């Protein structure tokens, strides 16, 4: 079944909104909250940091939301090409190549060229994206059956839940959710090469990579609804919102016995993240692609996020390599005394945006 292959503007804007907080938005809120006149921002500033271990804040959503959006694009990219006659084998090789590139970029991001490979951390944000996308995209490419895709999603949910809840770890038993006794730590120590960032486990490790593919597939099903369903745009947004609310409810109900922990990528964390991601996607899709709300100022805001969203991996790597804040300080350092450190961060965001705009 074919459908529209046009790229949804809301996807790029939502991805840009997501990346904005990583490249400086979160730090800007935190710095502004330190000003006496803006102290009311302190509760929001807390949301701009990760929880220490168990629980959930807004900033914990950034990574899984990106994964979810990557899944949403599959019907618009891979399936669109398959419909045009591109061989599945060629598409599969493209997915594998992309995964390898992301893994390599992740290793470079971790400082392979700077520090060498001795005591190097191989697990990375980009590596997890690459592996999880490889799993999700391969499932979609190797079968046209939606039923098969659903079964694979269910299998991943059951596999990770079973591992984390019921598989005993030698010396400790089953059902531990901590950095030492859990199945994540055990498998990372046995299978993951290099340094583990937390000593006994890595929050981007073996179990996490497989678990995160659930978000890719969840996004894929949302993408199928958006691209292929004959429902009206409003109905699509409503269905996504309802599904999102249901996933959030499931996560909260299960959380007393299956904790919401980002560092372990527990399935309750995935349910909660996917649920919020669905609601955000529904909101952005409804406002931008269905209602097409315009206005000069609003259009500029959308364009601001769209530029970031179209260059997400580029800006992620660039912020690691280019000292944007030091460049900003060169131009705005004289304003720190009268205004505060926030002006440096704001200047860095502006420089980053124009860097992407002129690429």
Question: Model-predicted segments: where are they?
Answer:
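Alpha-helical transmembrane segments and their immediate juxtamembrane cytosolic regions
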Residues: 1-359
């Amino acid at each position: 079944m074919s459908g529209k292959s046009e790229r949804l503007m809301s996807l790029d804007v939502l991805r840009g909104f997501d990346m904005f907080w990583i490249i400086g938005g979160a730090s800007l809120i935190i710095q502004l909250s330190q000003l006496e006149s803006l102290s009311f921002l302190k509760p929001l500033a807390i949301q701009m940091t990760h929880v220490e271990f168990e629980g959930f804040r807004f900033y914990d959503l950034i990574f899984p939301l990106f994964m979810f959006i990557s899944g949403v694009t599959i019907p618009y990219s891979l399936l669109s090409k398959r419909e045009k006659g591109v061989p599945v084998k060629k598409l599969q090789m493209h997915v594998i190549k992309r995964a390898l590139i992301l893994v390599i970029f992740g290793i470079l991001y971790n400082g392979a060229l700077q520090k060498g490979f001795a005591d190097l951390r191989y697990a990375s944000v980009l590596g997890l994206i690459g592996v999880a996308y490889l799993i999700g995209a391969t499932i979609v490419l190797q079968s046209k059956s939606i039923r098969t895709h659903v079964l694979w999603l269910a299998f991943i949910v059951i596999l990770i839940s079973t591992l984390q809840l019921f598989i005993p770890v030698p010396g400790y038993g089953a059902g531990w959710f901590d950095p030492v006794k859990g199945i994540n730590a055990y498998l990372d120590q046995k299978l993951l090469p290099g340094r583990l960032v937390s000593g006994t486990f890595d929050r981007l490790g073996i179990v996490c990579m497989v678990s995160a593919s659930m978000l890719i597939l969840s996004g894929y099903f949302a993408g199928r609804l958006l691209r292929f369903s004959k429902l009206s745009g409003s109905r699509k947004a409503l269905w996504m919102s309802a599904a999102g609310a249901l996933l959030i409810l499931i996560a909260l109900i299960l959380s007393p016995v299956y904790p919401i922990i980002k560092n372990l990528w527990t399935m309750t964390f995935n349910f909660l993240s996917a649920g919020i991601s669905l609601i955000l996607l529904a909101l952005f899709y409804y406002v931008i692609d269905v209602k097409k709300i315009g206005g000069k100022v609003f259009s500029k805001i959308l364009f601001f996020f769209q530029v970031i969203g179209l260059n997400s991996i580029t800006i992620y790597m660039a912020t690691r390599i280019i000292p944007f804040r030091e460049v900003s300080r060169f131009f705005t350092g004289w304003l720190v005394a009268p205004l505060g450190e926030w002006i440096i961060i704001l200047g860095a965001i502006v420089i980053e945006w124009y860097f992407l705009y002129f690429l």
